[in-house]
From Swiss-Prot:
Belongs to the GcvT family. The gene is gcvT. HAMAP family: GcvT (MF_00259). The lineage of its organism: Bacteria, Pseudomonadati, Pseudomonadota, Gammaproteobacteria, Alteromonadales. One of its GO terms (biological process) is glycine decarboxylation via glycine cleavage system. Keywords: Aminotransferase, Transferase. PANTHER family: AMINOMETHYLTRANSFERASE, AMINOMETHYLTRANSFERASE, MITOCHONDRIAL. It catalyses: N(6)-[(R)-S(8)-aminomethyldihydrolipoyl]-L-lysyl-[protein] + (6S)-5,6,7,8-tetrahydrofolate = N(6)-[(R)-dihydrolipoyl]-L-lysyl-[protein] + (6R)-5,10-methylene-5,6,7,8-tetrahydrofolate + NH4(+). This is Aminomethyltransferase.
Length: 364
């Protein structure tokens, strides 16, 4: 029996096409994935992300614990509400999950973990917390709605009350604030501005309806995937997992190597991988017709004239750009051209940094 979010009936009211997503009944689309994609790039769309898990980490050792648990360093967070993105690694340097951590105070943090990895994440966190003066509390009574797009903030402002609008005024990206019953964060998974709003389940349907009434278009998992891929954002389970280290997943920027005495989980393994040289995650664009898909092979010739091979981790047709884009894990000797094998033929592709669209415009 699949889990249902508190917004399940709202999805049905909007003719959501429901599919199983890691054990959750979630909307794939509400009629047109392409229209939903364009709504987020050009106006405002919203996603039910209540299947994600909110976890509060509270206690005297909260900072010390998270400095061990995460490859990024929460000690960098000094301003209440500031957030950072990073990997939770195993002892081999593999990515257990990628998550956002909000600093609320020196003794209180909030992390948001992926639905697909929830049980594994919580088991790992509860194992690692032993010996620390910390309470780890899952918050299943909280739902989450992401409102994204160039007009998302303006439309949300008509829904928020005066207290909430005052709280978010001038808020920079990657911050979160509790305002009355809502935790409102300037984060997202689309490459557009907007909010991710954590809301008590009892209020979630009314908030969803208020956003609908404000002209925010409901969007499903299909558009969520094309938007995040255009933005060059990883999807756990495709672009990385426990068999992949962050250096090979375009997450090297999220590893805080300094100070050298911070012994975060996976550090020793990761230092060895770094010294030996890791694969890298690149972006690919293809002018030819067709769509690059997960699992296809990528070939290129390195500077020594030796053929090298990599693998497509995510691929799609980009509605914004009008051609196929992909992310691929490849040996780090790759240049700026390669070939993808499609239907037993090799098709030329251009190699770029894995970021295709930001704020509605081509990013390369």
């Amino acid at each position: 029996m699949a889990n249902k979010t508190v917004l399940f009936n709202k999805h049905l009211e909007s003719n959501g096409k429901m599919v199983d997503f890691h054990g959750w009944d979630m909307p794939l689309n509400y009629g047109s994935q392409i229209e939903e994609h364009h709504a987020v790039r050009q106006d405002a769309g919203m996603f039910d992300v209540s299947h994600m898990t909110v976890v509060d980490v509270i206690g005297d050792d909260a900072c010390a614990f998270l400095r061990k648990l995460l490859a990024n360093d929460v000690a960098k967070l000094k301003v209440p509400g500031k957030a950072l993105y990073g990997g939770m690694l195993d002892h081999n340097g593999g990515v257990i999950d990628d998550l956002i951590t909000y600093y609320l105070s020196d003794t209180q943090y909030r992390i948001v973990v992926n639905s697909a990895t929830r049980e594994k994440d919580l088991a790992w966190i509860n194992e690692q917390v032993k010996g620390f003066s910390v309470e780890v509390t899952e918050r299943p009574e909280l739902a989450m709605i992401a409102v994204q797009g160039p007009n998302a903030k303006a439309k949300a402002a008509t829904v928020f009350n005066d207290t909430q609008n005052a709280a978010v005024e001038g808020m920079k990206p990657f911050f979160g604030v509790q305002a009355d019953s809502l935790f409102i964060a300037t984060t997202g998974y689309t490459g557009e501005t907007g909010y991710e709003v954590i809301v008590p389940e009892a209020e979630a349907e009314a908030l969803w309806q208020a956003f609908l009434d404000a002209g925010v278009k409901p969007c499903g998992l299909g558009a969520r995937d094309t938007l995040r891929l255009e933005a060059g954002m990883n999807l756990y389970g495709l672009d990385m997992d426990e068999s992949v280290n962050p250096l090979a997943a375009n997450m090297g920027w999220t590893v805080a190597w300094a100070p050298e005495d911070r012994d975060f989980n996976g550090r020793k393994a990761l230092e060895k991988i770094k010294a030996e040289g890791a694969d890298k995650l690149v972006g690919l664009i293809m002018d030819a017709k067709g769509v690059i898909r997960h699992g296809m092979s990528v070939f290129f010739t390195d500077s020594d004239g030796v053929e090298q091979q990599g693998t497509i981790t995510s691929g799609t047709f980009s509605p914004t750009l009008g051609y196929s884009i992909a992310m691929a894990r490849v040996p780090n000797t790759i240049g700026d051209v390669a070939e993808v094998e499609m239907r037993k033929k090799r098709v030329p592709v251009k190699v770029i940094a894995p970021s295709f669209v930001r704020n509605g415009k081509q990013a390369f």
